């Protein structure tokens, strides 16, 4: 399929909207009431520091809702206001945050049901409205919805669309897109659908395996088994790695994406030489500014003298996981939670580990005076961050009384 032509045709359709419906001011007031926080603004105004009793909170200087997330959530609210009685669906979670997705359900925005791992779009009628989330949707899903004739509201983050444009350039130049990402992640699924030939690598270790194969060859069957769920149909490592281009899931670690890009540039330079490098390697900057800012702020925060770190965000939020990884690599006691209810007591907190396991840690909050670092993922409302900070203040205040 010519995905570029399809996209252009869809965007000119009368059933397609990606600019909103003119209710921005009204919706902005509602979003401020539901998601923003006067406490968080106070901490910002105090140089990202607030001390109360035995607790000093140090907030990362970039955290929480990014512009793309704010835009997606606002467009979803606008859609309900513009279509007060129509059935509205969304193809995935609007963003990776449980409280926001719960709010979508309260607004009668339905999630496309999933049967045996596949979405059942038969529930969508031609008079319905379907929202595409901030991560985007695959070409196949968009085509199916277009054929149904339903109204499509596209909240895809422009940074994600930029990556789609990049893999289309790879395809035009007959380059295989090497995508740094998680093959199960909605964004990477969408991105790969715009690519021609593609291979998804999770980390630098997998990228090194591919680079070694390019330079020295290897066991083809082992390669295909290793990337069975992470490559395009009919992928042949002996044929499809002669010309490569780099792209990424926008929420991955910036530094690792850069390392992977440099690795493949060096690999193709070594194999084909400087004269032919540009024929065999393409790279465009697709690192999201918001992701980069939050990771840079986290790297700065963990240099401080902190007693522990709280990372707040959905458990399926990739960018939040990367923030947690930065903290753990620093050796800090660090707890990734999605909602304030994960804090059970001063002695007990339920949190997600990097491997995805949900565990409970006892005696997590030290006695006496403490400095707590706090950050949140790009899909986390300030109100959720406020709830967590207030809970920590309250627990320590109660402990001080006794």
Curated annotation (Swiss-Prot):
Family matches, as InterPro entries: LytB/IspH
Chain sites annotated for binding [4Fe-4S] cluster: 66, 157, 288
Reaction equation(s) it catalyzes: isopentenyl diphosphate + 2 oxidized [2Fe-2S]-[ferredoxin] + H2O = (2E)-4-hydroxy-3-methylbut-2-enyl diphosphate + 2 reduced [2Fe-2S]-[ferredoxin] + 2 H(+); dimethylallyl diphosphate + 2 oxidized [2Fe-2S]-[ferredoxin] + H2O = (2E)-4-hydroxy-3-methylbut-2-enyl diphosphate + 2 reduced [2Fe-2S]-[ferredoxin] + 2 H(+)
Membrane-spanning segments: none
Tagged with keyword Oxidoreductase: yes
Pfam annotation, one family: LYTB
GO process annotations (BP): dimethylallyl diphosphate biosynthetic process; isopentenyl diphosphate biosynthetic process, methylerythritol 4-phosphate pathway; terpenoid biosynthetic process
Keyword Iron: yes
Pathway note: Isoprenoid biosynthesis; dimethylallyl diphosphate biosynthesis; dimethylallyl diphosphate from (2E)-4-hydroxy-3-methylbutenyl diphosphate: step 1/1; Isoprenoid biosynthesis; isopentenyl diphosphate biosynthesis via DXP pathway; isopentenyl diphosphate from 1-deoxy-D-xylulose 5-phosphate: step 6/6
Active site, renumbered: 187
Cofactor note text: Binds 1 [4Fe-4S] cluster per subunit.
Residues annotated to bind dimethylallyl diphosphate: 96, 185, 317-319, 379
Residues annotated for (2E)-4-hydroxy-3-methylbut-2-enyl diphosphate binding in this entry: 96, 185, 250, 317-319, 379
A Gene Ontology molecular function term of the record: metal ion binding
The protein's Enzyme Commission number: 1.17.7.4
Binding site for isopentenyl diphosphate: 96, 185, 317-319, 379
Cofactor: [4Fe-4S] cluster
Alphabetic keyword roster: 4Fe-4S, Iron, Iron-sulfur, Isoprene biosynthesis, Metal-binding, Oxidoreductase
Enzyme class: oxidoreductase
Domain of life: Bacteria
Xref: HAMAP family: IspH
Family: Belongs to the IspH family.
Role, per record: Catalyzes the conversion of 1-hydroxy-2-methyl-2-(E)-butenyl 4-diphosphate (HMBPP) into a mixture of isopentenyl diphosphate (IPP) and dimethylallyl diphosphate (DMAPP). Acts in the terminal step of the DOXP/MEP pathway for isoprenoid precursor biosynthesis.
Matching PANTHER family: 4-HYDROXY-3-METHYLBUT-2-ENYL DIPHOSPHATE REDUCTASE, CHLOROPLASTIC (PTHR31619:SF5)
Protein's recorded name: 4-hydroxy-3-methylbut-2-enyl diphosphate reductase
Designated gene of the protein: ispH
